[in-house]
């Protein structure tokens, strides 16, 4: 077993709607490391979240190779499916067969092994063209964000449209971000990284992260090259306490910026001695959806809670990315309060916080819900379908 589900190899699922039926196809991403381990039938690489090779500390010490597991997200860019993992380059797949073509450098944009976010954002056309906005992070005492925009339409689909780099003081754990027409918004968590246990083979890299109780989280606001602040330096604004993996959406309200994010009281981690199959959820912080209003001019923010129910993997209608959206869909715990496994899918009206839910409990567990808008009625924000994989433990 892997020590943590996040160390698992990427498997892509494809839903095909034909003749009134749904066909499901799924295949592992045939990464170089997957092929090696499949052949040997054992772990040959350490996992970021704590999976170790056989042989104990001596076998793992000073082996700092990262296994590209291509397991976090999948997107379509031109004729390619791209399987993403934020610490390295994407893998290209055939969208029809899901066969693995190999690593992609995106037409020479990425250097070998360069970090490339698993959570790009798709601008629906704020500047008369649809584009993918994404980033890569180089971490250290001083961290650098590379912000990139790619065309997603026309003859130049997949071409790089803009590229800028900005550096910030401190270690940056940036898993996700949000966009508006003029800004790319990051939340730099107050977190530290002690690499020694990783180097000595005692922990995975992510297990060496720890929240800094005396740290000061910051919103990092980077002007988009397609927006009205192009070429200006980034802004740094104080942010709420807590830890954020994922953001829901962001939008501009005159000179202020609103961003909706899922906050944890602390960085949730599974230690070397823990077993993820026997986790006591009451001992782990839950994700709570909150809204922050940022005033870049005055370097201030306000923060309010949208829902107290434990949730993750929230999204809006893709046509409203970067705009004020009314509806959101997300995975939640079954109970209304407290932590727990994700067993339900919730739709929330962000204008009044009204909610409706569908539950797979007690023996069903949901994956990330995807909202697919109807092509027939784009004006109705919540007209579409919600697609998700559900694990039925009764049948497994």
Question: Model segments located where?
Answer:
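Beta-propeller domains
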Residues: 1-396
């Amino acid at each position: 077993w892997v020590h943590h589900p996040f160390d698992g190899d990427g498997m892509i699922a494809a839903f095909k709607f034909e003749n009134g039926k749904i066909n499901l196809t799924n295949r592992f991403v045939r990464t170089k490391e997957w092929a090696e381990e499949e052949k040997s039938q054992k772990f040959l690489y350490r996992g970021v979240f704590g999976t170790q090779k056989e042989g104990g500390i001596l076998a793992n010490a000073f082996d700092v190779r990262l296994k590209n597991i291509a397991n976090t997200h999948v997107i379509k860019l031109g004729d390619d499916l791209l399987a993403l993992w934020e610490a390295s380059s994407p893998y290209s797949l055939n969208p029809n067969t899901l066969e693995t073509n190999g690593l992609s450098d995106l037409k020479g944009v990425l250097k070998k092994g360069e970090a490339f976010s698993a959570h790009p954002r798709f601008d629906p056309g704020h500047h008369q063209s649809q584009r993918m906005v994404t980033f890569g992070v180089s971490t250290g005492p001083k961290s650098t964000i590379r912000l990139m925009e790619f065309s997603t339409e026309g003859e130049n689909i997949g071409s790089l449209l803009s590229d800028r780099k900005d550096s910030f003081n401190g270690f940056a754990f940036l898993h996700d971000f949000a966009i508006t027409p003029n800004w790319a918004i990051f939340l730099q968590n107050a977190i530290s990284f002690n690499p020694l246990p990783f180097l000595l083979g005692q922990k995975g890299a992510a297990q060496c992260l720890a929240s800094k109780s005396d740290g000061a989280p910051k919103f990092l606001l980077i002007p988009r090259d397609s927006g009205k602040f192009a070429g200006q330096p980034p802004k740094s604004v104080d942010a709420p306490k807590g830890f954020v993996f994922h953001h829901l959406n962001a939008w501009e309200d005159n000179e202020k910026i609103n961003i909706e994010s899922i906050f944890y009281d602390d960085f949730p981690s599974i230690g070397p001695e823990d077993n993820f199959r026997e986790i006591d959820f009451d001992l782990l912080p839950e994700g709570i959806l909150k809204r922050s209003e940022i005033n870049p001019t005055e370097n201030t923010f306000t923060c309010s809670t949208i829902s107290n129910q434990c949730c993750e993997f929230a999204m809006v209608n893709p046509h409203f990315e970067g705009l004020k959206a009314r509806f959101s869909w997300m995975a939640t715990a079954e109970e209304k309060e407290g932590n727990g496994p994700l067993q339900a899918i919730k739709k929330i009206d962000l204008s009044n916080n009204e909610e409706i839910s569908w539950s797979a409990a007690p023996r069903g567990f949901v994956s990330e819900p995807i909202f697919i808008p109807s092509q027939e009625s784009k004006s109705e924000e919540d007209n579409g379908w919600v697609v998700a994989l559900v694990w039925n433990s009764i049948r497994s």
